[in-house]
């Protein structure tokens, strides 16, 4: 993996120190044993996390798991779709996510104005549109969603063929 995907530095950032600490400690052990030349750190400080970075991979859950439960259960209690990326819950989650993502991108651009940002936060379409509107000239923000691949794979199963045989374009 080192030859195929060489890294010099990896920093894990989280706003919740208690949630982050076990992952960070595991990373300390794993990388010191398997990738000792990698500079590894974990932090709750945005400057430490973002300063001088070339690539930033982001995934956040605005409101945490408690709000995910609310986003799913409140619509279900009213006979509506209870899902985190669509329906009433998806819209609530999206609105929360947009605020936090915009703030995070502003922080990143303060410390790493030229970093590539790969965003994998849900709901992908809502967040991507908010970021496009807030940062219309920033061509280094890439929003990623795995749903198109899932649609192709599900369709291939329905058609009884390999997903590689389908051309979605």
How should each PLM-predicted stretch be described?
Residues 8-9, 39, 116, 140:
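Residues at the starts of beta-strands that form the adenosine-phosphate
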Residues 62-135:
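Rossmann-fold NAD(P)-binding glycine/threonine-rich loop
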Residues 39, 137-140, 144-169:
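Substrate/ligand-engaging "lid" and interaction regions
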Residues 2-3, 28-33, 110, 129-141, ...:
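Short, surface-exposed basic-aromatic patches at helix termini and helix-loop junctions that form
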Residues 39-52:
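Short acidic low-complexity segments
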Residues 19, 127, 151:
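Conserved short alpha-helix immediately C-terminal to the canonical SAM/SAH-binding motif I
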Residues 50, 54-60:
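N-terminal Rossmann-like NAD(P) cofactor-binding module of classical short-chain dehydrogenase/reductase
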């Amino acid at each position: 993996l080192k030859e195929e995907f060489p890294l010099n530095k990896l920093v894990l950032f989280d706003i919740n120190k208690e949630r982050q600490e076990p992952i960070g400690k595991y990373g300390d052990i794993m990388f010191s044993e398997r990738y000792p030349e990698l500079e590894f750190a974990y932090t709750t400080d945005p400057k430490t996390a973002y300063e001088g970075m070339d690539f930033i991979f982001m995934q956040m859950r605005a409101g945490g798991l408690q709000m995910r439960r609310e986003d799913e259960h409140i619509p279900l209690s009213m006979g509506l779709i209870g899902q985190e990326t669509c329906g009433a819950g998806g819209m609530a989650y999206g609105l929360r996510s947009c605020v936090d993502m915009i703030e995070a991108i502003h922080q990143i651009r303060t410390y790493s104005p030229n970093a590539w940002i790969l965003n994998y936060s849900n709901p992908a379409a809502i967040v991507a549109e908010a970021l496009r509107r807030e940062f219309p000239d920033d061509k280094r923000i890439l929003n990623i969603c795995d749903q198109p691949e899932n649609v192709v794979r599900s369709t291939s199963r329905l058609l009884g063929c390999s997903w590689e045989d389908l051309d979605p374009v």
